Every structure is written in C-alpha cells, then in structure tokens.
Amino acid sequence: MDFADPAQRAAFFAVHNDMPREGPGDRASVVEALRLAGPLPARPDILDLACGPGGQTLDLADLLPDARITALDGYAPFLRDLEARARKAGVLDRISIVHGDMARLPYAPQSFDLIWCEGAAYIIGFDTALAAWKSLLRPRGVLAPTEPVWLKPDPPASVRACWAAYPAMEDVASARRHAAAHGYDILGDFVLSDAAWQTHYYGPLETRLGAAAARLAGDPVAEAVLAEIRGEIECRRAYPEYYGYLFLVLRA
C-alpha cells in the first residue's frame, strides 16, 4: 500500500489504531532477549525505536524497574495510546515519549545502554540501522532488533510476493553476517514463536479487521487496503515455515 495516499493511510490506521502492539512479539521474547543481553548498568538508558503503542515498552519498564526509557515513534496516535497505558501501569514517570523519525535521530553519541527495535529496522534498511545506531550505544551497549528473515531456501513465488515490499530480505546466516560486519558481537538470537505472531498480533488484528470491513464497506480504496492486510495474515497462516522474525541481541 501507499502511505503517501491519505485514503489508503486512513484505511490502514482504521484497522491498526488501538492495537496492543504493531508487529509480531510478546513478553516472552522480551524476557529472552534481555536474558541474552546479560547484566545492564544499574540505571540503564534505553531507546525503544518505532515503539508503536508500546506493548514491548511496557514490558521493558516492568522487567527493568530502574531503567529510563525513551520511546520514539512517528505516528502520534500510537504515542497517545502508549502514554495512556503507561499512566495506567504507573510507569509514565520512567518513559519519555517522543514523536520523531528513527531515520533522523537527535541523540548524541553514546547516549544509551540498550537500543530496542521490534519489527522496524528493515524500514530504513537493516545495514543502515546497524551502522547508524551503533554510535548511539555506550561502550558494551546492546542493540536488540528484530529482522524479517527467510527460514527455508527457495520460498515459493506466492510467499515472496507477501514480502515484495522488502526485496532485501535475507536468511538467518546473512543477518548474522551483517551484524558481525558492523563490528557487533552476537550475544545470541532466536526466531519469534508462532504465538508472537498469531496470539499477540494477528489475532487482535483480525478482530479489528472484521469490524473495519463492516464500517468501511463500499469504499473501494479502503476495501483494497483491508484485502491487503487480510492477505498478509493468510500468507503467514499458510507458510509459517518459510519466514519469521529473527531477534538478534548484539554487543557494540
């Protein structure tokens, strides 16, 4: 879809607004990534990039009660959702919410102990993200991104079509090579579980998709956008063995 088209953008967010999270992931994956990261400083400074409505932000705040978290996203309604949820959870005083562009970050070098980015590094390019964000980490800081990867060679054309918007998508070994080439030590990695996709993302998304379809019936632009979202869900349901998100935990 074309986010520059106001009608398509409105239809997309008619489904995605008020979601608990904006991509595959869950608390269990946050716990595992933090385990791989190992001990952090006593009061770590964390940057959560493309935080969306903040499902993982709140998990980080809960699991790291002494952390100071900067949560950045380019879509203001998601940030309002995060603010409300953080206030309800009693952690708003430890989260700085920033409306900004992860491709143009305003932070000084060595500002953070941990940079987190679930499901969004590919938007600016995985290599670009690895290079740009490294300078923001303090010595022995950790970068924890998730990156879409092929899990099997030679995926069918129908599966590749699902990811046509990301032609640079590679396999697990390639993602590791890119990280090593940028001078990171790989502390560990793992592929997100099916529950991280279905239970915590596509399940809520399908519920909202049904409601939006009834509300937007008769609007051809909206119906095309909803069909694209539905196709994404169906692709994952049909071909989960061919692709996934790799959660990498990298030491600078």
Spans of features found by a protein language model:
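A short acidic, Gly/Pro-enriched loop at the edge of an enzyme's catalytic core
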Residues: 103-114
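A short glycine-rich, Lys/Arg-flanked "PGG" loop and its adjoining helix->strand segment in the class I
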Residues: 128-142
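Class I SAM-dependent methyltransferase SAM/SAH-binding core
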Residues: 47, 55-104
